[in-house]
Amino acid sequence: MLSSFVKRQAMTPTMVDRDTFVRNLRLSKLLTAQQFRAATEKLRDVDEAREIAKALASWKLLTKFQAKMLLLGRNTGFFLGPYKILDQLGQGGMGRVYKAVHQTMNRVVALKVLAPQVVESERAHELFLREVQAAAQLHHPNIVLAYDANELEGRHFLAMEFVDGPNLERYVKKNGPLPIELACEVIFQAATGLQYAHEKGMVHRDIKPANLLLQQDANSRTVQVKILDFGLARFTQPDWSHASETILSKQNTVMGTPDFLSPEQSKDLHETDIRSDLYSLGCTFHYLLTGQVPFPGGSIVDKLIRHNKEEAVPVDELRPGVPKTVADIVRKLMAKKPTDRFQTPDDLLNVLAPHAAPSMMDWTTTTPSLSSLGRISSENIELPEEVQVDTEPRAQTSTQISDAESILDWVDVNRKQRRRVRRFVLAAVLALGLLGLTVAGVLAWIWLGTAP
């Protein structure tokens, strides 16, 4: 009991005192010299750093995120080139995403700062540039627009369109399954964006609810869907053959999100085409209609096996109000063989159109309140230089597993099965002279006849 208390105390950061906060505010350059003088003069009689932070945030001189960082003693990392960091939006294996503003253009963007290990070599740097150049060709109302990409002081970043709305994973978790007509409309719009990308020779490879953002049309207030994150994209047109190896697609590595991963993508990342995206879209459709993934529970390997071997429970069984025609669309999208699915997003659009209609919906974008400024920890938020604080973790991130021992941690088998898997992994490592194997390698062995 005492040790737990001591541990909690050790994890709780100490906020700075008033004088340190004011000094850090000046060093941060978040305010102009005139703003700094005026603010400190007006707040000269305020003794608590937290009260000063609350006042500056209420006057819109600081964002809540910036105020928290300053209270934790940070005074650098608020700028990346022309961009001022306003907030942290999320994080994943590839890096972190911030809300930022281009100071000259006064344009708010989503700034994706890649983790250093993602672009370690010169070759990786070249591939990064090729990928973002391809992404810059995607100008479509159902795809998040890429504005800028650059490297500053070893930090690679992409500036993208900022969408002021939730992703569908978060929305469904909070509100439950979508109305049937709205779910059809969301999938219709996502398929429209995928068709455009398909015509440009691009396969997304990580379609899932978390990568579909919602925003309201400024005039009609109807829902608009935006596809996010072509970071795992594969280029299929001859003009992009030089980019078929991306910084995010190492040979024999399973990448994507297990709950939404097509059978063929778990076997061979480089042979996927648009039909793989359609399978993932079908899994997403299933989630929007039922509020659950097609194969809930189990380990990552369990999920991948079930995607290959089992049929998901039909959506009209889980939700009896779903029309049979809609359930049949979901079932066809999730066919195990690519040849049994819709062959292009256009094929899907033709049959889905009667069920989709522009819809209105409301949501509230929630942000941390100033009352929480005293209850923050210092683990998962990071500014582009060195700052670390806490944020809400993403429930589902893309998966890449390539270490032989880590596979054994994921495989949910009994002790006897684990020994068989370990012997296979170690034998293969020795035979091939490799340092590790991927989940795909283990699955290939399981698929040959040892799966339960």
Residue ranges of model-derived segments:
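Juxtacatalytic C-terminal regulatory tail of Ser/Thr protein kinases
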Residues: T339, Q343-D412
